[in-house]
A protein has these predicted regions:
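A generic structural signal for short coil/turn motifs at secondary-structure boundaries
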Residues: 61-64, 99-101, 131-134, 184-187
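C-terminal accessory domains and tails appended to enzymatic cores
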Residues: 2-9, 13-18, 154-167, 181-290
């Protein structure tokens, strides 16, 4: 990793992004909270309106039947979004762990519609080409997001959207998750000021993601006649303390080289067109009167 070209991004005061919209697109309940919970809280604090989109139905996680797991993850997904401050949630319900078999055209088309309908400026999601990605839901989502970001601004793709009042939309920039070791990243985001919201979101990931590990440990110790002062006197305190102490180690390590308490990593893509092209500059310098 070329550390010379890594930019450190910190919270900007005064809500400089007020009026802008971002969409965080993840596959599973716990993806965004772990991989970008701090960034999403930061963007909202800076004035963005955020929308959370989950592509899978999470039927494989939750400890119950497929139907029970789907419902449990759906309910917890809304709580995760509320903990960060998202305005709304969209669940697309593709079959968990089998998204490599779905129609990418279908997923891409739904994402294009949402980007246009919500007037999205910034997208946060997976790196479609990230190394070591084993989960088919992750790379299927990442690829569809990448394609949708490009096609969203093409008026001849899904022209019925335009006729229905949802104009083509150019995505301005993207933050790609650092989801696996050795995936590329060029931006380190200081999430220290937003760590409490990240913790709150992870705590809501109880069907999967370890949000209730603290209360479970507290209950096991109580049966043995023991307690950990760290876990406090109630289940909610136990869950938050457990997340803070044991589930944030990666984010501490990401911040250490930059003297940050907590950080998240991303591969950032700036898709904004330059304000002035070389053609504009050439015309200004060389145009003569007729």
């Amino acid at each position: 990793m070329d550390t010379q070209h890594i930019l450190i991004e910190k919270t900007q005061p005064g809500q400089p992004h007020k009026g802008k919209v971002f969409a965080a697109v993840h596959a599973h309940l716990d993806d965004m909270p772990y991989l970008a919970g701090g960034l999403c809280a930061k963007l909202i604090d800076e004035g963005y309106t955020g929308y959370l989109i989950r592509t899978s139905n999470d039927e494989k996680r939750g400890g119950g039947t497929a139907a029970q797991n789907i419902l449990r993850n759906e309910q917890e997904h809304s709580k995760v979004a509320a903990a960060i401050g998202f305005k709304d949630v969209y669940d697309l319900y593709y079959q968990n762990h089998e998204m490599d078999a779905i129609s990418t055209l279908d997923l891409r088309g739904r994402l294009i519609f949402l980007f246009r309908y919500l007037k999205v400026d910034t997208v946060v999601s997976f790196n479609a080409w990230g190394h070591g990605e084993e989960n088919p839901d992750h790379w299927a989502t990442g690829r569809a997001v990448e394609e949708a970001c490009w096609m969203s601004e093409v008026e001849t793709d899904f022209p019925e959207h335009i006729e229905a009042g949802f104009p083509a939309r150019a995505i301005q920039d993207r933050y790609c998750f650092y989801a696996r070791q050795d995936q590329p990243y060029n931006r380190v985001v200081d999430i220290g000021p937003h760590i409490e919201k990240k913790i709150a979101a992870i705590v809501e990931c109880r069907a999967q993601g370890g949000g209730n590990f603290g209360s479970e440990l507290r209950a096991r110790l109580a049966k043995q006649g023991k307690r950990l002062p760290l876990l406090g006197n109630d289940d909610r305190s136990a869950d938050r303390a457990y997340v803070r102490e044991f589930l944030l180690d990666n984010y501490r390590e990401y911040g250490k080289p930059y003297q940050l308490e907590f950080a998240e990593r991303f591969y950032y893509l700036d898709r904004r067109s330059p304000r002035r092209s070389r053609v504009d500059e050439y015309v200004e310098k060389n145009a003569v009167a007729l």
